[in-house]
């Protein structure tokens, strides 16, 4: 099964594609969609077109996207919601089922700790997918979203699904930290 993860943002939208076979996770591609400094409609169109292109080029079976959180600044929350909507439209236009997870669910499923830092997310994604280099934070969050979906969005402690992948690499999670 191929899963596309999306980390929505008005300026930068991260994407990550992984293949899942049993408990094995394989990296396919990741990156970001950068919007131009332009009016809102143009930026949303760029996100929609970018996501549509990724769906067309990589043919994922399912997609997962981060839910919007209510920020201190309501204007920022509204803009993020619109960017997220443009990405969802690109996914749905490509015929994909879309799952949604909160940032807390994402961090718990990937790192094992709901208050994990960006660096911890990047480190864990790099290790789980056996990447030679560390992806940027937006791409890492998107890859993490795909990993979260691959394992049903459950926490690392209840899932057993990541345990074999971690054990193969000589790793385990203890108190929300990756230890070897």
Curated annotation (Swiss-Prot):
Mg(2+) 2 binds at residue 66. GO terms for biological process: DNA recombination; DNA repair. The active site is at 7, 66, 138. Its EC number is 3.1.21.10. CDD domains: RuvC. Binds 2 Mg(2+) ion per subunit. It is found in: Cytoplasm. It catalyses: Endonucleolytic cleavage at a junction such as a reciprocal single-stranded crossover between two homologous DNA duplexes (Holliday junction). Mg(2+) 1 binds at residues 7, 138. It holds the Pfam family RuvC. Its cofactor is Mg(2+). The keyword Endoplasmic reticulum does not apply. Keywords: Cytoplasm, DNA damage, DNA recombination, DNA repair, DNA-binding, Endonuclease, Hydrolase, Magnesium, Metal-binding, Nuclease. GO terms for cellular component: cytoplasm; Holliday junction resolvase complex. InterPro entries: RNaseH-like_sf, RNaseH_sf, X-over_junc_endoDNase_Mg_BS, X-over_junc_endoDNase_RuvC. Belongs to the RuvC family. The RuvA-RuvB-RuvC complex processes Holliday junction (HJ) DNA during genetic recombination and DNA repair. Endonuclease that resolves HJ intermediates. Cleaves cruciform DNA by making single-stranded nicks across the HJ at symmetrical positions within the homologous arms, yielding a 5'-phosphate and a 3'-hydroxyl group; requires a central core of homology in the junction. The consensus cleavage sequence is 5'-(A/T)TT(C/G)-3'. Cleavage occurs on the 3'-side of the TT dinucleotide at the point of strand exchange. Homodimer which binds Holliday junction (HJ) DNA. The HJ becomes 2-fold symmetrical on binding to RuvC with unstacked arms; it has a different conformation from HJ DNA in complex with RuvA. In the full resolvosome a probable DNA-RuvA(4)-RuvB(12)-RuvC(2) complex forms which resolves the HJ. This is Crossover junction endodeoxyribonuclease RuvC.
């Amino acid at each position: 099964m191929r899963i596309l993860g999306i980390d929505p943002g008005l300026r930068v939208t991260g994407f990550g594609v992984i293949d899942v076979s049993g408990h094995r996770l394989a990296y396919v591609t990741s990156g970001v969609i950068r919007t131009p400094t332009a009016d809102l409609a143009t930026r949303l169109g760029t996100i929609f077109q970018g996501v549509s292109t990724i769906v067309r080029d990589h043919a994922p079976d399912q997609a997962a996207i981060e839910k919007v959180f209510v920020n201190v600044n309501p204007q920022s929350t509204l803009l993020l919601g619109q960017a997220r909507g443009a990405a969802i439209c690109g996914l749905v236009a490509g015929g994909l089922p879309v799952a949604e997870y909160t940032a807390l669910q994402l961090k718990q499923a990937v790192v094992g700790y709901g208050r994990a830092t960006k660096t911890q997310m990047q480190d864990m994604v790099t290790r789980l997918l056996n990447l030679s280099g560390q992806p940027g934070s937006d791409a890492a969050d998107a890859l993490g979203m795909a990993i979260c979906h691959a394992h049903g969005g459950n926490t690392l402690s209840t899932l057993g699904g990541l345990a074999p992948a971690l054990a193969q690499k000589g790793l385990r999670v203890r108190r929300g930290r990756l230890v070897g």
